[in-house]
C-alpha cells in the first residue's frame, strides 16, 4: 500500500498534473476521496500513457481504458458484475481545469520560490558585476538552489513537482490580497494618463531617436514565441517583418480586463510596453518573513518579476543610507546644521559636478538641520555629506553592510541613487532601521516536508549587526519626520496616518522614469516601485514617487 501510495502521489497524469491530488483537481475538480469508481478508474488508466489515454485529447481511448480498469476490478471482486455493466454505460464527465501558473493568488511569488529552489550556481556571464554577491548568497543561503544541493536516498536531486514535497512559505494570504489589490488599483488609475500622453505626443519612448525606438521594438520582437517559431521555420528577415505587421486576432491585456481584438503583433508589443508596471513587497523586519510579494500587474502577460529580478535606479530612497553613514560613522546628528547652498563635487574623472534639485528650489544659504534636508529630499544635503565623507567607497561599503547586495559604483553620484537595486534588497535593507540596527535577510520559506510529513529542511534568516541601536532609532525618527513634514506627508493628509508609528521615503529617478516609496512601521517594512518596462517610456509630468508609489503603500496599510 505504501508503494502504491508513493507511486500515485508522484506519477504524471497529463495536463501538468503530478500526483493523484493534482489529477483529481485538474480533471474533476475534486479531492481524491470524493472521486467515484469510474473517475478513479479513469485516472488509474491514464498513468500508463498520459497522452494516449488523455480524456481531453483522446476521449474514446480514455473510455475504453477506463472500462478495462473496471473490468479488472470486477475480476478481483472489488465491484460486482452488475455494477460493472452499469458503470460501463456512464459517459466520461469532466470538469477540466488544467493547473496554470498564471492563475490564482501570489503568482509571481510562487514562480520566484520555484526558481530559487531550482537555482543553478551563478555564473559571471549571467550576473556581471553582481556575480560575486550572487555567488556568495547561493553558497551561504541554503534556500538558493536547495533542489540542486540536496539529494534523496537514491542519490538523485529533489524534484519539487514529482517528489510530493510540501513547501511552507511565510506569505500572509490576507496581506497578499491587500497588496495585489492596492497595486493594481493604482496602476489602473495611472494608465489613462500614460495613454493620453502617448495619444497627445504620438510617442511612447520619450527623448529617444526613431532609430533607438526601433531597436527597442526589434529587441522585443526577438524575445517572442512568434519570432522564434518563424526563425525555426526558416523565415527571412523580410518575411518576419511582414508577419509582425500583419493584423491577426489576439487577446491583449488592459486594466479593464482582457480584450479580444484585431492587431498586428508589432502593435501588440507597443501596446504592452505602454502598460504601466509596478511591484510591491512587505516583510516583518524582526523575523525577516516576507508577508506580501507582487512582482507585476499580471503574470500571464508580464512574466518579468520586478521585485527580485528587475533592478532600477533607486533615486532618493538611497538617501537614508547616506544620512545613516553620516550619523553612524561621522558622528553627525539630525540637528547638525548645514547651509542651504549648492555643493560642488568631483566626478570619477576629476571634473567638477554640482547636483541639481528637482523642481524649483531656492538656495538661500540659511542653515538647516540634516533632518530638514532628508525630509525635503534635498540633493545638496546628500552631496554635502559625500563631500565631508571624502570617500565614496566607504559609503558604498556601508550601504552593502545595510543589506544591499547589488553593485554600487563608488562615486559621489551614488548619493542620488544612481545604483540599480531590486525592491527585494531595498525592503530588506530598510528593515535594518526598524530592527534596532540588525540586518535580517528576507526569508520566504520556513520548512520543507517530504510526502510522509517528515521535515527534511528548515530555514532561518541570516542576521548581521549593521549599525548601532541608537543610530537605528535616530533614523526611524528621521523617516517618521518625512511623513510628518516631508515628501511623505500625504500618508497623514490623505490616508489619515496621524496616530500611527509610520515613516517613509519617496524616490523619483531622472525624468520620472522610476517612482519609489519605502515605508516602515515597527512590525512591517514595505516598498513600492512603479514605472514602465522600458525606462525611455515614462510619464513626463506627475510621475514622482509621492504621487505614484506612495498611494499603493497607503492603500495597503489601510
Stretch-by-stretch model annotation:
Residues 1-232, 385, 400-401, 405, ...:
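Non-catalytic, structured segments within soluble enzyme domains
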Residues 12, 16, 32-35, 39-42, ...:
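Secondary-structure capping and boundary motifs in well-ordered enzyme cores
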Residues 12-17, 31-33, 37, 71-85, ...:
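Bacterial peptidoglycan biogenesis and beta-lactam-recognition machinery
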Residues 19, 38, 48, 64, ...:
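Short, solvent-exposed loop/turn segments at the edges of secondary structure
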Residues 22, 67-71, 107, 111, ...:
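Residues on a specific face of well-ordered alpha-helices
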Residues 27, 49-55, 160-164, 303-308, ...:
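Flexible glycine/proline-enriched surface loops and loop-helix/loop-strand junctions
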Residues 33, 97-115, 332-392, 439, ...:
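Conserved catalytic neighborhood of penicillin-recognizing serine enzymes
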Residues 107, 169, 173-189, 219-284, ...:
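A penicillin-recognizing enzyme superfamily signal
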Amino acid at each position: 500500500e505504501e508503494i502504491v501510495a508513493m507511486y500515485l502521489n508522484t506519477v504524471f497524469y497529463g495536463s501538468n498534473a503530478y500526483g493523484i491530488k493534482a489529477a483529481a483537481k485538474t480533471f474533476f475538480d475534486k479531492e481524491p476521496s470524493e472521486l467515484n469508481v469510474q473517475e478513479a478508474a479513469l485516472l488509474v488508466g491514464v498513468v500508463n500513457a498520459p497522452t494516449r489515454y488523455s480524456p481531453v485529447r483522446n476521449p474514446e481511448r480514455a473510455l475504453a481504458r477506463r472500462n478495462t480498469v473496471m473490468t479488472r476490478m470486477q475480476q478481483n471482486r472489488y465491484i460486482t458484475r452488475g455494477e460493472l455493466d452499469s458503470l460501463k454505460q456512464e459517459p466520461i464527465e469532466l470538469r477540466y481545469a488544467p493547473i496554470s501558473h498564471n492563475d490564482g493568488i501570489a503568482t509571481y511569488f510562487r514562480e520566484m520560490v520555484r526558481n530559487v529552489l531550482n537555482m543553478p550556481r551563478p555564473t559571471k556571464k549571467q550576473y556581471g558585476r553582481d556575480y560575486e554577491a550572487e555567488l556568495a548568497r547561493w553558497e551561504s543561503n541554503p534556500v538558493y538552489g536547495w533542489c540542486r544541493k540536496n539529494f534523496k536516498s537514491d542519490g538523485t536531486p529533489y524534484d519539487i513537482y514529482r517528489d510530493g514535497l510540501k513547501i511552507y512559505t511565510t506569505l500572509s494570504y490576507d496581506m497578499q490580497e491587500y497588496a495585489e489589490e492596492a497595486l493594481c488599483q493604482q496602476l489602473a488609475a495611472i494608465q489613462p494618463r500614460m495613454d493620453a500622453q502617448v495619444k497627445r505626443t504620438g510617442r511612447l519612448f520619450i527623448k529617444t531617436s526613431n532609430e533607438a525606438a526601433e531597436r527597442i521594438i526589434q529587441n522585443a520582437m526577438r524575445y517572442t514565441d512568434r519570432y522564434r517559431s518563424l526563425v525555426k521555420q526558416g523565415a527571412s528577415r523580410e518575411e518576419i517583418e511582414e508577419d509582425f505587421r500583419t493584423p491577426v486576432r489576439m487577446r491583449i491585456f488592459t486594466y479593464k480586463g482582457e480584450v479580444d481584438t484585431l492587431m498586428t503583433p508589432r502593435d501588440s508589443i507597443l501596446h504592452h510596453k505602454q502598460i504601466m508596471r509596478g511591484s510591491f513587497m512587505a516583510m516583518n523586519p524582526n523575523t525577516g518573513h516576507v508577508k506580501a510579494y507582487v512582482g507585476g500587474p499580471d503574470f500571464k502577460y508580464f512574466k518579468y518579476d520586478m521585485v527580485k529580478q528587475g533592478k532600477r535606479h533607486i533615486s532618493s530612497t538611497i538617501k537614508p543610507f547616506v544620512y545613516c553613514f553620516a550619523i553612524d560613522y561621522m558622528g553627525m546628528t539630525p540637528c547638525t546644521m548645514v547651509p542651504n547652498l549648492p555643493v560642488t563635487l568631483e566626478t570619477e574623472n576629476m571634473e567638477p559636478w554640482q547636483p541639481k534639485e528637482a523642481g524649483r528650489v531656492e538656495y538661500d544659504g540659511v542653515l538647516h538641520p540634516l533632518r530638514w534636508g532628508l525630509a525635503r529630499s534635498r540633493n545638496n544635503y546628500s552631496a554635502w555629506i559625500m563631500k565631508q565623507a571624502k570617500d565614496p567607497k566607504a559609503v558604498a561599503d556601508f550601504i552593502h553592510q545595510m543589506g544591499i547586495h547589488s553593485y554600487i559604483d563608488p562615486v559621489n553620484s551614488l548619493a542620488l541613487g544612481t545604483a540599480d537595486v531590486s525592491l527585494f534588497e531595498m525592503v530588506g535593507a530598510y528593515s535594518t532601521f526598524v530592527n534596532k540596527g540588525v540586518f535580517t535577510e528576507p526569508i520566504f520559506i520556513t520548512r520543507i516536508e517530504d510526502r510522509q510529513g517528515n521535515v527534511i529542511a528548515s530555514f532561518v534568516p541570516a542576521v548581521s549587526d549593521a549599525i548601532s541601536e541608537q543610530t537605528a532609532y535616530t533614523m526611524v525618527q528621521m523617516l517618521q519626520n518625512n511623513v510628518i513634514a516631508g515628501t511623505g506627508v500625504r500618508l497623514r493628509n490623505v490616508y489619515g496616518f496621524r496616530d500611527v508609528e509610520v515613516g517613509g521615503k519617496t524616490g523619483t529617478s531622472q525624468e520620472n522614469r522610476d517612482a519609489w516609496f519605502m515605508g516602515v512601521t515597527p512590525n512591517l517594512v514595505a516598498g513600492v516601485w512603479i514605472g514602465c518596462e522600458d525606462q525611455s517610456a515614462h510619464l513626463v509630468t506627475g510621475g514622482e514617487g509621492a504621487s505614484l508609489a506612495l498611494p499603493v503603500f497607503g492603500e495597503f496599510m489601510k
